[in-house]
């Protein structure tokens, strides 16, 4: 009896046993007029982000398919993709987090390799999480999570002040990172120094910022006392980073992405969304509805709520970020170059040169 029951379970749930390749769903037939471009990313969590990026670049001649590297040992990570640079081409491109490679320019071997790779695209911001946490987009995250559009907190102003506050420690952390052999200010210390443990909504989080300023000042003073010989070299280092676009106001876009998301932005969002939900519930309970009608109204509202983290991970309202604009231009140049080469090689036969140019222009207008 138990054996028959297990057999029935297998029929209803194919995941009770490993499926063979022959049993897996087959991909839909591709458009023969479009060239398939394989886009490899660092990990599974990056697939959705880069899918959202390349959705802005649809055109009649190329189709992008996003995935982790397709190898039997299922490798993942930036190092794996960097090992694939020699294989990259018009039909195989690589997308990675910049980490510090953009800011460091040619100061390290890895930054030179990333910045000079013809078919590798990087975020310019430290990681994809920094785009998701782009300050002007955070109010919309609250609206989608709570279904309440009331503005009770200025995310842009707070993140401006936060970024300026942590800027001195960011310089120490970045300087320590580019030394590679010296553990002056490692990530674990940077993370503990720039995290916010709470948000006091009064005066747009000013008390929280004051608390952070005190912590940052203490840590900076300690670093200067411990490493007096690094103070002058750091001034030159700062000028070089500013030449790459770093400012006190946008430092949060270049800091460690998971630290920003988990220890700063999620603290803000949880606090703000809690208040917005409470406001909506208070409005419902203060209404004239009673009994079953009130209960149904409350259920309708609570059922419409979404996980704050899930909404943040789905956030795509970062397209006005200047760093995204740089990534956008890189991809546009690659697409224009590839389509032009396809036309010259005869891969695009039916469309005239003017038609190709018009289609490319229309594709850019979609963005």
Predicted regions and their residues:
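Acidic, divalent-metal-binding catalytic cores of TOPRIM
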Residues: 2-367
């Amino acid at each position: 009896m138990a054996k028959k029951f297990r057999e029935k379970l297998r029929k209803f749930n194919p995941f009770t046993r490993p499926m063979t390749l022959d049993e897996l769903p087959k991909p839909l037939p591709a458009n023969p007029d479009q060239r398939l471009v394989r886009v490899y990313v660092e990990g599974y969590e990056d697939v959705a982000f880069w899918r959202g990026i390349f959705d802005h670049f649809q055109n009649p001649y190329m189709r992008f398919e996003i995935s982790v590297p397709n190898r039997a040992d299922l490798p993942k990570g930036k190092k794996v993709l960097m090992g694939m640079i020699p294989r990259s081409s018009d039909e195989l491109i690589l997308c990675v987090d910049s980490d510090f490679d953009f800011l460091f320019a040619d100061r390290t071997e890895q930054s030179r390799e990333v910045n000079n790779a013809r078919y590798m695209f990087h975020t310019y911001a430290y990681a994809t999480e920094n785009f998701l946490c782009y300050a002007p987009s955070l109010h919309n995250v609250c609206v989608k999570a709570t279904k309440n559009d009331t503005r009770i907190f200025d995310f842009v102003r707070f993140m401006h002040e936060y970024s300026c506050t942590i800027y001195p420690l960011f310089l120490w952390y970045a300087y320590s990172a580019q030394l590679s052999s010296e553990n002056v200010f490692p990530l674990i210390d940077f993370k503990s120094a720039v995290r916010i443990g709470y948000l006091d909504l009064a005066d747009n989080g000013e008390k929280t910022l004051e608390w952070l300023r005190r912590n940052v000042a203490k840590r900076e003073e300690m670093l200067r006392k411990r490493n007096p010989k690094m103070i002058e070299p750091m001034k030159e280092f700062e000028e070089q980073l500013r030449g790459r676009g770093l400012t006190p106001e946008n430092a949060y876009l270049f800091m460690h992405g998971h630290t920003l998301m988990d220890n700063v932005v999620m603290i803000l969002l949880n606090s703000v969304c809690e208040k917005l939900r409470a406001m909506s519930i208070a409005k419902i309970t203060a209404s004239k509805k009673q009994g079953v009608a009130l209960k149904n109204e409350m259920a309708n509202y609570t059922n419409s709520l979404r996980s704050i983290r899930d909404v943040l991970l789905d956030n795509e309202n970062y397209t006005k970020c200047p760093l995204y604009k740089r990534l956008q231009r890189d991809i546009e140049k690659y697409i224009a170059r590839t389509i032009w080469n396809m036309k010259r090689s005869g891969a695009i036969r039916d469309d005239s040169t003017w038609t190709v140019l018009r289609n490319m222009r229309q594709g850019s207008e979609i963005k």
